[in-house]
């Protein structure tokens, strides 16, 4: 379990937040690829391989990092409907 936690921590280091890049949205390695864009591509049905082919400067670990970041965000104690 500790090894898994270390792996996730290593992945999360790939996520950067810089007010000068994409208006401060969480991005992949300081590049102009917001985490939400990666998640939208995946939820739209693109495979990891298709994403990597379309965005040459991304690495497989970047996609895993986006998923790990999203998973971490869902670990909240309470979610309030935004309706």
Q: Residues of each region from the PLM?
A:
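Small, basic N-terminal interaction modules of short regulatory proteins
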Residues: 1-83
């Amino acid at each position: 379990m500790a090894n898994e936690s270390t792996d996730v921590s290593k992945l999360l280091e790939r996520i950067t937040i810089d007010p000068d890049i994409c208006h401060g949205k969480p991005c992949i390695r300081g590049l102009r690829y917001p985490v939400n864009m990666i998640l939208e591509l995946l939820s739209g049905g693109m495979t990891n391989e298709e994403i990597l082919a379309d965005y040459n400067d991304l690495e497989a670990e970047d996609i895993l990092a986006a998923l790990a970041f999203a998973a971490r965000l869902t670990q909240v104690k309470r979610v309030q409907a935004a309706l």
